[in-house]
């Protein structure tokens, strides 16, 4: 299991991303607008840099919902490979069966 502090850190990042999403997208739209003035683009770039680092979605890490494990993560299920296998063996995941040929 992942440390509790790592899970809390990820939760904090998720909240920051949600809080600054609108502001971040507005600033990016100004920066990418070909008709915008260079000064406006420069100001938008500076404001974007002043936002918290953790408010950027690329700093988030997908983690298992049960254990917090960061590797071997299956997006479709939100679980790590280990917990997904355990759930499949118990029959908790509908339609998922062990391969046999």
UniProtKB/Swiss-Prot annotation:
GO terms for biological process: translation. GO terms for cellular component: cytoplasm; small ribosomal subunit. The keyword Ribosomal protein applies. One of its GO terms (molecular function) is structural constituent of ribosome. Coiled coil: none annotated. The keyword RNA-binding applies. Keywords: Ribonucleoprotein, Ribosomal protein, RNA-binding, rRNA-binding. Pfam families: Ribosomal_S14. InterPro entries: Ribosomal_uS14, Ribosomal_uS14_bac/plastid, Ribosomal_uS14_CS. Binds 16S rRNA, required for the assembly of 30S particles and may also be responsible for determining the conformation of the 16S rRNA at the A site. NCBIfam families: PRK08881.1. Belongs to the universal ribosomal protein uS14 family. Part of the 30S ribosomal subunit. Contacts proteins S3 and S10. This is Small ribosomal subunit protein uS14.
